[in-house]
Amino acid sequence: MSADSPRRHPSGVVGSGIGLGSGSGTGLGSGSTGGSKSGAAVPAIVPPQTVSDRSILDSAIGFINDVTLANQPVQDPKDTITWARFETCADVSDPRFGDDWELEGNAAPPLLLILGYGLGVQVWAIPANGEAVEVLSWRHGVVTALRVLPTPATAAALDENGRADEPVDSFAEKRPLVAFVDGGSAAASGLLAGSSGLGLGGGGGGVTTVGGSVGGVSGIGVSASAQFSAVNFMSLKTGVQVKTIKFKNAVLDIQANRSAVVITFHERIAVFDARTLEDRLTITTCYPSPGINPNPIALGPRWLAYAEHKLLHSKRSGGGCDGEGVPSYTATVLNAAKSLSKGLREFGEQVAAGLTGTTAGSGASSKSSSFDSASGGPDAKQSGVVTIIDVKHPVKDYSPTSGTPLSSTAGSQGGGDPIVAHFVAHSEALVAMEFDSSGMLLLTADRRGHDFHVFRVQPHPVGPSLAAVHHLYVLHRGDTSAKVQHIAFSLDSRWAAVSTLRGTTHVFPITPYGGAMGVRTHTSLHVVNKLSRFHRSAGLGADGRSSSPISHSESTTFVQSLQPYHNPTLPPYPRPSVVQPLAQLRQPFTLGSPPGSAGLGGGVGGGGVMGSGVSAGGHGVGVGVGSNSQRQRQRLSSLSDDSGKPLSVCSIFAKSRSWLLEPPMATREQPHRVQRKAVDSLFVMAGHGALIQYDLDTKLASHVAKEKICDDTPIELEVEARAQWNLGRRKDGSQEIAPPLGLDNWLIKDRHASLLLDSANQFDDPDERTESWLAQVEIITHAGPHRRLWMGPQFVFKNYNTPSGSNLNHVDAEAVEIGVSKTTTTTLPSTAASSALGLGTIIGKDRSSPLNMPLSAATSVGGAGIGSSAVTGRSGAGVPVLIESGSYSSIEQSPKLMDRFRHGHLDSDYGHGDTRLKEDLADAMRESPSTAAARRETTGNYFTTDQLDGLALNNNNNINNNIIPTKDNASPNPNTNTNPNAIPSSNKVQKAEVTDAVDYPIRHSYGDHGELSTVVNIEVFDDQLSMSSISTNSRLSLEGPPSQSSPPLSLTNGLMDTNLMHFSESVTGTGVAQAQVHGRGANRFEVDDDDEEEEEEEEELDEEAEPDDDEREDRPLGRRNL
């Protein structure tokens, strides 16, 4: 423990009226009395109520009253809400753990809202049905902080192997626990005696801000601050205080996750183990904050972020905030006006002070100078620095920034350096920060409140110096100062809400990966990829530039351009985007509202709340980015943020809970609680005691024409105040609900049925446990593109000649050249059917010697012709036409996975995708003028697959397969089946067993005169699929005139139109080889058989054609060809 860390007294029951079990009874319930009260207490239930929009006149009157702070009703200080927070880490309210236990369907977990009063505390649960239930309430003592501690993660969850010295949960039988700071009777009397101290430093009372994420204010005198230096832990199940930890300094806030409990003080932070409540880490290098929270922190699922008092260059991470950016013209003018007015005011104060002999303004100047002095010596403090540490493993007696060595215990457990990142976030002092639900995004706010920064942390296992912090966004609130008191993220990290001290909540659109926002990113139900299908298929980066090695930018090297994903920890880092708020929701200061507002029955003041949530403007709730009226309204309301009365406001994104307000005759086929929207509702709780649900809906920007809508089209946000709950304390005085709580209470009911315990205790039946875990599941995170780049009309296919002996580059390596080599032909009898089909000979299967591809132009390489109708010439060099389809990730419904993991109910969808792909390929071919010329010469001697299916069966059976050796193949390969009766049916084509060889035989289809026409090859690699359309006869060239003796085969008609890349599971055709792609264990192309006897004969044929082991070993291992 550091020498200047807070002193901790021995744990136990404190007897001076502070603890729970004290004899004076001023604690939070004493002994059996509290239990008897909780058993007899009936929880209050508050249903949702509609929110009525105020008229323009009423809104104007309310705005004047809010600004002038006049006509405020006098309220009892002990019933005033001093702080509020939403509890998101408790077992019952954690959105990452299951649904509601009593509701069916996709029901959201209940919201847990904690309200701190002048005397006592109150906890509400708002389940998915919309009826708020009071789950905890007491009126004794001043509570400045309260947290419902989540159940700690078990050792099995922390480490799969487990460790013998892993601490166990010492309070497993007493959970759930609450941690709170209770002031006792002395603090209560101090509050009642000096209620004027409720302001920020007003009167004689000091300020103790509570909640790093809420920042509520409790008016406690300085003399009573020592009473708030103890943290008590109480069991809600038994009502017994299990532990008390006392410190020498006042406790500001308590935060907790499933591995640690964090307690903050002025310039200090203490971290305790969540299972044993023992010391884990002490931080004494915090920078003091000038905001409402003297020591702001952010606690995520694993990391803890806090404001550091000095920047250590040895631990500084890459990235961060390079500066505040270029100020706008309006901000420049306002800053100049402020500087001029400030100078004139100081000059006037100095003149007045010289005449009167006083020193006015010295206090304010000294206060500001204490935070502005960032330079002046080697030990001077620097503002705006953030340090993120890992609090998962025990790291005791270690100061992260002072460099104190780790103890042997921490080092043996793999603690290492706990610092994850160390960077500069702002140039001013930090006043608030918050992690998102994933713990990777961090939003920070400085004391001016003009801009909020969003960072994405990219850790490195070596240390913080190799980590990177990406500055994604600059959320611009306005050009006037404001104090931030609360920050909230949506569960999918696409929206952020920032609340200021005047009660205004600003809603910003963001993305987890940065970049521009638009229709594509914020109107879908799910988070989309950073690159759209258009960018990925066209090879464009996020900035719209080509990512090819030829046209790379200056900041992108050649090696980086070849990588599919850039290393996020290496520069260059992304530049931040400036984002304006899409909505600004303002809360009134009191419940006293003009006529026409919705009444809150039994509430304090008996009034309602402003329905629109906007300070002025009536029904103008849906605010776009370019709304000048909203910006002007925001500027007027924030001018007095620093001097006005504070209003405690907190917010949270959650599913809607207003379905009870739907008309009684409305259909319940799809209840509101299960309807999915692109953005969740926003719940805002203000100090007047009313919780308001705002329904958010995205729409297209109004200034964009319909014909110009694209993925990057800006959006607007429509806001509707849907429902409200009056959760303030009643005048009649409700009964206390103190521990021990009943089994039907939301805080403890059905805890053992949740997913928070060890996985071994979840299922009684081993079979049920096995079924719940999906093993060996392959996740496809990227969808295929909707088109290929080469399919556009701007591409024309031409002949590509490769001179013999020339050097080939990477692009040439993708070409497959077909020449006449060792082949075995099959002569078809001249029958009526063969003449009609245009099939004269079929080249049989043969294997050549292994060659390094593509040095020989006369050898078939890469499995050319397998699974395709290969129509080629007998002489001449290969003339390939390249068609490259891109990387494997761009394949639309990858045939590898599609055929291997095909399901019966998905056949129609895959078939539709195959048909569309063939149609797209045919359309792309028709754009070529050379193919159009060839199409005009096409005669009617060639049939499509559908036409072949319509032929008479007896005509189809007239075609026989015979093997006739040629001069190029005088000695056929013994592995080649030469039995003329091997395949008796004409609509059955010999199967080709696919192995990992480089060179493969070619399957050729001849016309009725034995002339070669064209060939289409389909090559499937481990990570890429490419196609080549090849013509090897000058008379059948795509650009040359067609032969009169043998009509050419057009790329857009006949066989090629229907058989190009056909991956269906069952296709019937005559004389046409259909390609079917299977997994690695069944790599074979086949033609569907309807006769079982013919299938058996084909299997025998495959066994005879299987190569020897010696022959397989001689082949070089290269790309896998299908």
Swiss-Prot record:
Locate the region Disordered: 1-41, 357-382, 620-644, 966-990, 1033-1054, 1071-1122
- Locate the compositionally biased regions of type Acidic residues: 1087-1112
Q: What effect does gene inactivation have here?
A: RNAi-mediated knockdown of the protein in the hematopoietic system and pericardial cells causes a decrease in macropinocytic uptake by pericardial cells.
Q: Which InterPro entries match?
A: BCAS3-like, BCAS3_dom, BCAS3_WD40
| Pfam families to which the protein is assigned, alphabetical | BCAS3, BCAS3_WD40
GO terms in the biological process aspect are:
autophagy; macropinocytosis; response to starvation
**Residue ranges under compositional bias (Low complexity)?**
357-377, 626-641, 966-987, 1036-1051
Q: Which residues carry this modification: Phosphoserine?
A: S55, S638
- UniProt keyword list: Cytoplasm, Phosphoprotein
Task: Provide the tissue specificity.
Answer: Expressed in all postembryonic pericardial cells, but not in cardioblasts. Also expressed in Garland cells in third instar larvae (at protein level).
In the record's own words, the domains note is: Has been proposed to contain 7 WD repeats. This prediction could not be reproduced.
Q: Which family does it belong to?
A: Belongs to the BCAS3 family.
Q: What does this protein do?
A: Regulates macropinocytosis in pericardial cells.
- Protein name in the entry: Breast carcinoma-amplified sequence 3 homolog
Specify the species: Drosophila melanogaster (Fruit fly)
Q: Which gene does this sequence derive from?
A: rudhira
